[in-house]
Amino acid sequence: MAVNQNFCTFLLFILLPAIHGDFENSVLDEHNRYRAKHNTPKLTLNADLSSGCASYAKEIAAKNSLDHSIGNYGENLCVRSSNPVECVKMWYDEMKDYDFKKPKFSSATGHFTQMLWRSSKEMGVGKAKSSGGLIYVVARYKPAGNVVGKFKENVLPLGGTKPECSYLIMLLWVILFLFK
């Protein structure tokens, strides 16, 4: 019996991080898939951010609330009855309400703009299940996005030109014009 219990404990310590990591990596991959559509650099996972996300997800799941925390990061929250990775699609779907011609913050598109925020380099993610079976998801981003006055250069349209490339394109046009 002791051998089986020790073996089960060993398996738990080996498999639990892998299962948890799969969720984190799936959310990261979804973010980066959407960011690529907007020529926005990939995010990387930050273990400290993820740890804080997991703790906060437990807190809001216990309260059944979606109250934002306060910190030096951007934050997206979501609650689902099933597949928590679908939160990323839900946040991205806010794009339909975002006006790229008048880039600014809106509470209707804040999740979308944060997940695509070009200057954000790292993210963390965590989840927790409430007593009612709902799954609460917390994603945090560093540096924080949704900075007033910085939307145009940080939230690019689909297939958007990278800001550093736009200068090269402009330079090529000038050269072509001068040497015509």
Indicate residue ranges for each PLM-predicted region.
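Conserved, non-catalytic sequence blocks in retroelement Pol enzymes and Pol-derived host proteins
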Residues: 18-22, 80, 107
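Disulfide-stabilized extracellular recognition modules
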Residues: 81-180
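A solvent-exposed, acidic/Ser-Thr-rich amphipathic alpha-helical stretch
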Residues: 66-80, 84-88
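Cleavable N-terminal signal peptides of Sec/SRP-targeted secreted and luminal proteins
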Residues: 4-20, 168-179
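Short, well-ordered surface patches within globular domains
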Residues: 19-73
